[in-house]
Amino acid sequence: MSRKRTSPNRNVQIADQIQRDLSELIMREVKDPRIGIVTIQSVELTPDYAHAKVYFTALTGDPEKTQEALNHASGHLHNLLFKRLHIHTVPTLHFHYDQTIEKAVEMSRLIKEANSTRAKDDDEAGAPAQDD
């Protein structure tokens, strides 16, 4: 007897639904003062739906304290998701601060700095600055 595999598309659909539901539930149901304005960036599910990595950004507040508070509230959020989702297994939630935005800003700053240094070096050498 062959086991039925879950399709990658279904995994993405469930992850997207969890992302939408968590965004709403955190805003309306979680009353922890350590949690400021939070945006759920993405949700990654294990193939068996047992665990979900939930990546968030925090517009206000300390990201570490926010992560701690969200992980503390994960059991409550799990129960609320169970009432909303119509799937057999609702995953255990693991919250992680998403540093993608900060890393992108830092990379942009480094690129600008490198370009301005290169232009300055070209000007000092008497060669025209090149645009790539």
Curated annotation (Swiss-Prot):
The lineage of its organism: Bacteria, Pseudomonadati, Pseudomonadota, Betaproteobacteria, Burkholderiales. One of several proteins that assist in the late maturation steps of the functional core of the 30S ribosomal subunit. Associates with free 30S ribosomal subunits (but not with 30S subunits that are part of 70S ribosomes or polysomes). Required for efficient processing of 16S rRNA. May interact with the 5'-terminal helix region of 16S rRNA. InterPro entries: KH_dom-like_a/b (IPR015946), RbfA (IPR000238), RbfA_dom_sf (IPR023799). It comes from the Bacteria. Monomer. Binds 30S ribosomal subunits, but not 50S ribosomal subunits or 70S ribosomes. It comes from Burkholderia vietnamiensis (strain G4 / LMG 22486). GO terms for biological process: maturation of SSU-rRNA. This is Ribosome-binding factor A. GO terms for molecular function: ribosomal small subunit binding. Belongs to the RbfA family. PANTHER family: RIBOSOME-BINDING FACTOR A, CHLOROPLASTIC-RELATED. One of its GO terms (cellular component) is cytosol. Signal peptide: none annotated. Keywords: Cytoplasm, Ribosome biogenesis. It is found in: Cytoplasm. Its main location: cytoplasm.
